[in-house]
Amino acid sequence: MSSQVDPSELALVFLHLPKTGGTTLHHHFSAHFTPEETCPERYSNLKSYSVDELRQWRFFSGHFNADEIRRIPRPLFVVTVLRDPIERLLSNYYFWKRHKADYIEENGKVALQITKAGTLLDFLQSYNPHIFTTTVNFMTSRLAGDVLATPDGYALIQDYEQIGWLSDAQLVNRALKNILSFDVIGDISQLADIYAKVAEVFGMTPLTEVARLNTKEDEHELMDQYTPEPITPEISSLLEEKTRLDQLVYELSREHWHRDSHRLDVGEGNNRDFTPLSREPGKRPVADWYASFGL
């Protein structure tokens, strides 16, 4: 964010990575904006809106990736929250697992159906796209942009089409460049500090505390109770393997925000000169992988 930009011209963009305390911050951020100022999109689908539609809103909050938010034709103030990658992955598993069977059947949620029917080991070993893309370095992929983790590597997507592959180094590089361009970033344990920094810029109501919402302890009519499954050596190994790059990005980000008092304001990142790898022999296009599951 440029220090010369009038805050009234800024769009607040909350890039909400699932199971990082984002429901809490969304609740408090949204109280500052009228419905007319608020983009209704809560998932990764900003590309379905026209530039004119995006221009009318000042608050964006959803499970976005770092590429699609660049379509917003305003000066941006970008906020995100990270979490220990293994904790986040387990939290996401139990969140999906807890959904009642009736709700899953009624809404046809494939990822929830698969999760509900199996074990944690089944979840971590699944190659179904609805599961695999969310278990393999998910935070890094979202922070890198419109990227999907596949069994053959990391696919870079543009306008719903695959345009190339990313190496591990390229994926991490894109994620870190984007993180360094964000205005406020922190850990799930720092929600109050994160809110305070955003509130100062946008003139929001100060809060004495920021209580967590949507936690596993919360009772909900659509949720079952759950019993944690034992973490066997095999599961532990899979958790480490599937979050390897997430852990690297998380630790590097932690070092940076602790050094800079959680404030990252180093100018806008620019990945437009980035050239992905061309299609490689032996690697299936994403469309073929999905088709093998009848998707």
Task: Annotate each language-model stretch with its function.
Residues 249, 253-295:
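Long, low-complexity C-terminal extensions of enzymes
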Residues 1-64, 85, 91-92, 97-109, ...:
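PAPS-dependent sulfotransferase catalytic core
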Residues 21, 84, 186, 198-199, ...:
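A residue-level signal for conserved active-site and pocket-lining positions in enzyme catalytic cores
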Residues 1-2, 57-69, 221-228, 271:
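Short, motif-level signal for alpha-helix interfacial/capping segments enriched in acidic residues
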Residues 40-41, 167-237, 265, 269-279:
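The conserved 3'-phosphoadenosine-5'-phosphosulfate
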Residues 26, 89, 216-219, 251:
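Hydrophobic positions within alpha-helical membrane elements
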Residues 193, 234, 238-252, 256:
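A non-catalytic, amphipathic alpha-helix used as a structural packing/dimerization or gating element
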Residues 46-80, 87-210:
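PAPS-dependent sulfotransferase catalytic domain
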